[in-house]
């Protein structure tokens, strides 16, 4: 009988060889099951899943022939079933922070339409979380460009609402924040604080008192004084962050600008078993050598507990709304600092961009390249040609990220080189008015030209750039299909795509961008059962209603991960090295003997590796608030520490790149290597000793 039923299944549809003689774990039926396979929409009556993979897609009779005693049959009740959405570009590591913050995006993505709404949302967040007095309250998504009548959020607003807590409200650009009085004090910003070059500290009218908003370089000390995550937080915040993706129907997350310390953090959480979706990281080209030292390229590419390194990130310019994107013609509104005839600037000169692309090509890994302005895209194409040296036979997976101001003459070159553009159509809603003001109507309306790219034979992807824009795949699809600004104006309607093409850019074509088209992106036999259930079919509703479609359920490899109430997820794992007694370097009292006298003092290096350091200007070190600052004699190094029980956990060390006398450079290198190995310390009066594995590696004396 079993053989007969399997034969029926094989005759009625597609069934995998491994499913022969085996009952399915789950069968989905009675809905719009959209496979996303092919140039035109294809629906099947039923889908069967076994051991995390799709084993049947076809007629209902064939699927039901695979029903066993333990098979779960899901009646979709007319809802839509699609492949799980794939994040084409975003900043996953930042989601670990915002998952534990109040969301203040303006409508339609959040409550932050004006100052009273922001204050109400912050108070509600603090009450729901039962945040105790004195604890920092953080939020993200504040957009001052949409505040009515120019009434902006300031410290007085935050002080009145939350007088007993430091409050930090991050700007939507992630380049600044509004702080209340307690937060300004916490981060050491006062009337006496000078505005650093390239920074902004908004002052209260008629005074030098900070009024709350700090931006750019003035914002950097806030990061420097923010303690690193504990081992427990890495795990708990990973799970909370990945639930944000699951809630949006996403089964693969993109970490598109990764430093070494962040990869190490993701790896630790991965090894602890925290992941419920796939995470793919693309380290910065500037960190590549350091990352290769710890993560050889032979370990890239293949998932290990749902994490892998996917390639290398190169950034060639800034943002068009911030007027830092690089163009061939000047901005109509000048530069961000009032510069005339301002075209923006590249992140790297052309020769360095060439070398960077060549390095990635020779390494044999994919490249993702941030290009916003048309001049940056010109730079990319030149660097691509330099790397290839005319040899285009070897496949090379290259994607340009954002690609917003692609010119029409760029498209044939992308086709020729088989480069995939990843577009950012959400800007047609959020920033179209700004782009048109900065670049003129013709160029500002041609942003993210997805229609022309598809018509030329390209298979572009689309992305949210989360956390810069909200993690809302249906709103992203709506923006690609409709191209309507926040003010209700059409923005380049000739570049609209069909709903099916828009879905392609976040499923099949996104899988191709990752090089994972053999396992993701379509509902085909043998592929992973990464699925999303929507309350409506995007192809069967009015185009303007697409943004209102909601995610009902998200399934990763056959297991429900959203909603949490219906999921079969295991408990959040416990950090192996975290006993719940974790301390950050601080000047406040704690159980670690000697830390009170050690933090905040200037420590001068006296011995290194058992050898006396006898220099007129020896290296010095300071630490406080979880941050470490070192002057090596030529270069400045910075990093982070955490005290765990009786030991020290070192974070990433980053150094400036100045050159100096060979003997000083050699000493710096030895000093940096010693610091990276530290696992314990001892303070005796004005003397500090650092050790590794029970052996002293460096000794210091405190400045008098």
Task: Locate each region found by the language model.
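Gram-negative bacterial Sec-dependent N-terminal signal peptides
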Residues: 2-20
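Divalent metal-binding segments
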Residues: 23-29, 38-295, 301, 310, ...
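A mature extracytoplasmic/lumenal domain signature
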Residues: 60-61, 108, 141-143, 173, ...
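His/Asp/Glu-enriched, well-ordered alpha-helical/loop segment
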Residues: 236, 357-368, 375-398, 402-403, ...
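Extracellular/periplasmic ectodomains of large secreted or surface enzymes and adhesion receptors
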Residues: 563-581
């Amino acid at each position: 009988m079993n053989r007969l039923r399997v034969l029926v299944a094989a005759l009625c549809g597609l069934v995998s060889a491994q499913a022969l003689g085996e009952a399915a774990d789950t069968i989905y039926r009675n809905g719009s099951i959209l496979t996303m396979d092919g140039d035109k929409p294809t629906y099947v009556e039923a889908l069967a899943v076994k051991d995390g993979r799709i084993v049947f897609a076809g007629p209902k009779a064939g699927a039901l022939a695979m029903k066993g005693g333990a098979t779960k049959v899901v009646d979709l009740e007319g809802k839509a079933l699609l492949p799980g959405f794939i994040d084409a570009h975003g900043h996953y590591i930042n989601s670990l922070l915002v998952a534990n913050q109040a969301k203040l995006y303006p409508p339609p993505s959040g409550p932050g339409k004006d100052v009273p709404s922001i204050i109400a949302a912050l108070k509600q967040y603090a009450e729901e979380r039962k945040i105790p007095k004195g604890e920092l309250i953080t939020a993200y998504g504040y957009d001052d460009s949409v505040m009515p009548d120019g009434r902006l959020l300031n410290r007085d607003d935050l002080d009145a609402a939350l007088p007993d807590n430091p409050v930090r409200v991050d700007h939507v650009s992630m380049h600044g924040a509004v702080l209340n009085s307690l937060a300004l004090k916490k981060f050491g910003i006062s009337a006496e604080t000078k505005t650093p070059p390239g920074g902004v500290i908004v002052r209260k009218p008629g005074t030098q008192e900070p009024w709350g908003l700090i931006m750019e370089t003035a914002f950097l000390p806030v990061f420097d004084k923010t303690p690193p995550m504990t081992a427990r937080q890495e795990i708990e915040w990973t799970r909370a962050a990945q639930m944000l993706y699951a809630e949006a129907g996403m089964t693969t997350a993109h970490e598109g600008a990764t430093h070494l310390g962040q990869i190490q953090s993701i790896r630790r959480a991965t090894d602890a078993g925290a992941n419920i979706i796939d995470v793919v990281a693309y380290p910065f080209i500037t960190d590549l050598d350091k990352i290769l030292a710890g993560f050889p390229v032979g370990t890239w590419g293949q998932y290990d507990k749902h994490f892998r390194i996917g390639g290398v990130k190169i950034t060639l310019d800034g943002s068009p709304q911030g007027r830092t994107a690089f163009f061939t013609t000047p901005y109509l509104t000048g530069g961000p600092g009032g510069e005339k005839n301002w075209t923006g600037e590249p992140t790297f000169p052309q020769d360095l961009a060439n070398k960077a692309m060549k390095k990635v090509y020779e390494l044999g890994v994919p490249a993702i390249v941030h290009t916003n302005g048309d001049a940056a895209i010109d730079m990319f194409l030149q660097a691509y040609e330099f790397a290839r040296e005319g040899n285009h036979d070897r496949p090379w997976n290259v994607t340009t990220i954002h690609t917003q101001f692609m010119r029409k003459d760029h498209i044939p070159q992308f086709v020729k080189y088989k480069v995939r553009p990843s577009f950012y159509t959400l800007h047609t809603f959020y920033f179209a008015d700004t782009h048109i003001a900065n670049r003129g109507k013709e160029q500002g309306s041609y942003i993210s030209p997805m229609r022309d790219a598809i018509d030329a034979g390209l298979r572009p992807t689309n992305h949210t750039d989360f956390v810069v824009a909200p993690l809302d795949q249906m709103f992203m699809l709506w923006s690609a299909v409709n191209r309507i600004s926040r003010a209700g104006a059409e923005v380049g309607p000739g570049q609209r795509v069909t709903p099916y093409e828009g879905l392609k850019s976040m499923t099949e074509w996104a899988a191709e961008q990752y090089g994972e088209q053999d396992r993701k992106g379509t509902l085909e036999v043998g592929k992973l059962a990464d699925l999303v259930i929507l309350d409506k079919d995007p192809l069967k509703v009015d185009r303007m209603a697409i943004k209102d479609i909601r995610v009902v359920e998200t399934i990763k490899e056959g297991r429900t991960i959203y909603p949490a109430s219906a999921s079969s997820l295991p408990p959040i794992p416990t950090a192996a090295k975290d006993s719940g007694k974790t301390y950050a370097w601080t000047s406040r009292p704690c159980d670690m003997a000697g830390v009170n006298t050690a933090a905040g003092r200037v420590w001068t290096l006296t011995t290194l590796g058992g050898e006396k350091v006898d220099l007129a200007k020896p290296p010095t070190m300071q630490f406080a608030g979880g941050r470490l600052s070192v002057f090596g004699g030529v270069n400045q190094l910075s990093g982070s520490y955490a005290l765990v029980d009786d030991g020290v956990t070192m974070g990433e060390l980053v150094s400036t790149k100045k050159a100096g006398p060979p003997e000083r450079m050699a000493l710096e290198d030895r000093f940096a290597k010693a610091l990276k190995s530290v696992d314990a310390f001892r303070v005796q009066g004005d003397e500090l000793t650092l050790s590794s594995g029970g052996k002293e590696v460096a000794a210091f004396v405190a400045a008098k």
